[in-house]
Amino acid sequence: MGRKSNESCSSSLHVSSISQENHSQWNLDAEELFDEKETFSSENDGAAGGKTNKSHLENPAEQLILQLTVSEHAHSRSQQNSSQGVFQLWSSPVNKGSTVDKRNSSVEENVTDESDLSENEKMNDSLLSYFKKMDLNLKPETIEHVERPFPEEAGQVPVYADFLPAPFNTLDLHRFAFSKCESWKAAVEPPESSIERLILRLLELERLQHMTIQRERPRLQSTFYSSMFSMAERPSSSKAIATKAKAPKIPETSTLQTSGVDKNRDKRKNNSGSGKPEQNVSKWSLSSAGKSKSNSRALLKCSSTSKQCAVAHDDLKNSKNSSLNPCQEPPLKPTTTTQATQPMARVVSRCLPPRSPMPVSPIPLSFPENPREEGKVPRTKKKCHRKSILLNRAFYIQKRNCLSPSLIARGKCSPTDQK
């Protein structure tokens, strides 16, 4: 035991005398030895089937050395992490190798990227570099504005260049263009073939120009007149709009109405012998006046065209020629008001009684001049007539009940009621 303790002390002193420079290498070697022994021991344990490891028991000094190196390595790692960060001394040679490998790989990648460029891109780069080197001084030429005097008189005709040579430039092309034959040849000497073709072409152009002018002239006139009409149709003020908005006048209805009223007046004079009392006539005038008002309103709504007036006149004639049927109401006495219309005249002509064979002298009847007074009287009489109807209705019902055989048998009705 004393020998073993001396060996362990000497080994510990030997470890403490190791310099700090070789400390990292020693740590790496110790770790490698430790790993190899662990693997070796695991293999021996698997082969022996659970036998004890004799090497660990035989060499306790090596175990102590390994423990000391591991503890020192942990202590140095904690100090380096606190002072310098994550950098570790024991792994420094490995990190240096990795950084060198990374640099080499980045250089290779750059080379491959340059080689991946296509030929077109390389050509474009070369062209851009070529154009950048070019220095072009492009400047516009300066034009000098020189004002030259141009003598022009007020009555002078502008001179144009002659298309034809001297003997032919005096030809009146407009006059010769519409000649039936080639009279221009007689006016001048016969020209050469080329000049003759040029003269013929100029004459043809003159002819075409004249035809186009004649064709476009009516179009210009039509457009001018249409614009003038459009300007005239526009109302100049609000008064013109008001006059257009007014209802159109009825030109021929008044003449038709007057003629119809006169004819009806003659008929009524002939048939006045079979007239009724004045009260019934006033009733008839009131009802006919109401009808005439409604018909006049309907007539005013209609348009006053000549065709419609002609149709109305034909209807009036047909109604006069038709057979006259008697009506329940008496004929109408003519009034001073001009409210008689065409439909009213038609109704009167249909409702007149047949003519009597014996001539009867007319009976003059007096009517109020104001139509308002005329309308007031029959209204009151109408009301009285209605009251009399209501009063007589009860007696009529009683009389009808008395005529029934059942009531007569019972003796409820008096003999006077039965009569």
UniProtKB/Swiss-Prot annotation:
Domain of life: Eukaryota
Composition bias, Low complexity: 7-19, 236-251, 282-296, 334-345
PANTHER family linked: PROTEIN FAM217A, SI:CH211-266K22.6
Polar residues bias spans: 252-261, 271-281
Region described as Disordered: 1-60, 96-119, 236-299, 317-382
Protein name: Protein FAM217A
InterPro entries (alphabetical): FAM217
Gene this protein is translated from: Fam217a
Family: Belongs to the FAM217 family.
